Amino acid sequence: MSSYMHPLLGQELHLQRPEDSRTPPDQNNMELNRSEADEAKAETTPTGGATSSATASGSSSGRRPRGRPAGSKNKPKPPTIITRDSPNVLRSHVLEVTSGSDISEAVSTYATRRGCGVCIISGTGAVTNVTIRQPAAPAGGGVITLHGRFDILSLTGTALPPPAPPGAGGLTVYLAGGQGQVVGGNVAGSLIASGPVVLMAASFANAVYDRLPIEEEETPPPRTTGVQQQQPEASQSSEVTGSGAQACESNLQGGNGGGGVAFYNLGMNMNNFQFSGGDIYGMSGGSGGGGGGATRPAF
């Protein structure tokens, strides 16, 4: 048996030897292929890196960033600064009339000294010794004097400084008596404050008088390209407020006979504002061609 197994083992060992002998060439081939692949990769690596970097830079430069830029949401806005006031602006005032003073006289004096028109919007307080004119009374209205203390329900009116006529302004008051009676009318005399009286008022520097209705003209007036615009003669526009201590007395029409235009300055430069010409009550310049002989329109 041993003699029979020995040749078989010898054949198996002999058959395994060629396999062992063929293994090293395969390993050599694999190593050779690896070395060639490494060399090829080493040769192509610089070019490939440059291409990838160029592609990355191009994509980053061409891509638009998402979202708003940093700090753009809360940027401070520049403040709005008004460096010059308009001559037609209204200024609000709270006027307090002391006890024992005549409200009508106090408002008129305030308008004259300040050189502006005053519009009384409302009033609160109590008055005594009221002289009013009631239009509903017989014979075209009568003047009555009320003695006693009355509470102000409503007080409105205007006060214009000279040279405006007295009929252009005035006060209207409605009062409540102690027994619940209500009386009112145009203030025709004294209106004495019985305690502090607070008035809400608005002042204006310029007021233009227009007579209505405006008659239609056959040909429309020519349009001007500048700031100054002439009004049609049918409207008979005139300045109600004239020149006072603080008035701008310069003739904005250039002395061409169009009539002087004067208004109260109120401490602001209004030489750059131009208004239409017209007859100013009592202030028409005699040097103009037709300003001196114009008649004052009736209220």
UniProtKB/Swiss-Prot annotation:
Residues 63-75 bind DNA. Pfam families: PCC. Its main location: nucleus. It is found in: Nucleus. Residues 240-251 have a biased composition (Polar residues). Residues 1-87, 216-251 are annotated as: Disordered. The keyword DNA-binding applies. Residues 44-72, 224-239 have a biased composition (Low complexity). GO terms for cellular component: nucleus. GO terms for biological process: negative regulation of gibberellic acid mediated signaling pathway. Keywords: Activator, DNA-binding, Nucleus, Transcription, Transcription regulation. Gene3D superfamilies: Hypothetical protein, similar to alpha- acetolactate decarboxylase, domain 2 (3.30.1330.80). This is AT-hook motif nuclear-localized protein 25. Transcription factor that specifically binds AT-rich DNA sequences related to the nuclear matrix attachment regions (MARs). Binds the DNA sequence GNFEI (GA-negative feedback element I) in the GA3OX1 promoter. Binding to GNFEI sequence is required for GA-negative feedback regulation of GA3OX1. GO terms for molecular function: DNA-binding transcription factor activity; minor groove of adenine-thymine-rich DNA binding. It comes from the Eukaryota. Expressed in seedlings, leaves, stems, floral tips and flowers. It comes from Arabidopsis thaliana. The gene is AHL25. Homodimer. Interacts with AHL27 and AHL29. The PPC domain mediates interactions between AHL proteins. Residues 87-233 form the PPC domain. Residues 14-23, 33-42 have a biased composition (Basic and acidic residues). The keyword Amino-acid biosynthesis does not apply.
